[in-house]
């Protein structure tokens, strides 16, 4: 048993590059999960302890509690996505590994080793590798969680924050990172259980090509240019390899588009939240104030919390009504056209309501104010609306609130009258600082996601293309011994993957955009923070260039490996 363990370990770690990629994927999944979860569990435990002992929780702690619950969803999302990607990579590698080492498997079985023993060894080796990655990721996540704690301190003005991890969450991470990876290492082996020892030793299991695969590959290859026809037919007769290529391109494209969208959305939010505003002070009152004349550089407004009902959704919003048209706050549509104040029985909504819930212009929505429901027409979608805010006419909002017309509880102004100096005042500087802080925070998150997206996408793509190339190693060496030139072999077996890669990109890019829109929409609804989807042709073009660059780098590396095999005189080892 020990000799088989040593031999399998040696053959596995001979693939240094691939095993390093698998280790890094497991480590990354563990790191991202614990990076978020460690900053959650300690604080949730602390807040729960305060509640149990009857201690009061202030407003900042309540906001922190909401953020922690939202981040729990984020941590679970990280764990699931990274675990699925890692499991996919492990499955691909070990499927190729078993195919390329059938003779060794046949030898183990010929010497009396059972399938259960082989599976146990494979599971143990792979789980051990994943366990080391799990521990490394946990330690790094614990250390780096200080970054999130610092963000909590700056966002919620709370100094007493704690790290921690619940045993249940530690066990969940272990199951997804370690156990799942071990299982995915042995799942491909079950395909080889049906082969007898003689078939394995001959290295040519008696598999019959599915007639439908042959038929489809022949039909599809006839549709491509003549110079690619033979190569295309050869590639399509390996449907799993082609499927994995398409899937990896899809994952790479989704991760890349998502990361770039997150980066640009933070700037988009900052720009829309500063557009059309030329006031310096926002003076707010707890109670409604009676009308009295204001300075020319001031205007008052009325605000109230409301609920919008739309297709079964109850959406909390803030309603604002301005007393008169003013240059202090100019409404703009999504295409940057100026808007006047809404009319009676009309409402202006923000972009988030339109994008997340599908409310369109001229639709009718139900607005619940003080337990009374009003049906209003959506007259426009305001591109520069305040977050979670809708706009009505001031007389209409006053009527809904059953207060006198021209009453107000807020003033926008460029000066602060002396009688209001002790009121709640949000200055332009404070407002811009808050937006900038959120912008920087969002950009940091976007850069992290961008780097992770590119790293994971590149690694996954690298793994798939390299494994497909390695699958051709034996055929390349045989053709070389038969006298075919390197250029001819390249055109026949390797170059076809470049057009396949580009076809996969063209097919998957539209689907990737839809997936990214769905993910960002779901995150926006779950967290309550609107994340507008942002992409353009330059981003798509950049992803395509990066995709082809990765292909050429892998191609060069593979050609160098083939040359090393030939120069070292190891051709027979790969053929026999």
Regions found by a protein language model. Give the residues of each.
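Interfacial "coupling" helices/loops that link adjacent transmembrane helices in transporter permeases
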Residues: 88-128, 460-499, 569-570
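Hydrophobic alpha-helical segments
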Residues: 65, 69-70, 102-209
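Peri-transmembrane interface segments
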Residues: 13-24, 35-81, 96-99, 121, ...
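Small-residue transmembrane helix packing/gating motifs
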Residues: 381-415
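Short helix-loop junctions at transmembrane helix boundaries
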Residues: 42-43, 70-74, 138-172, 503-569
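Juxtamembrane segments of multi-pass membrane proteins
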Residues: 227-352, 361-363, 367-368
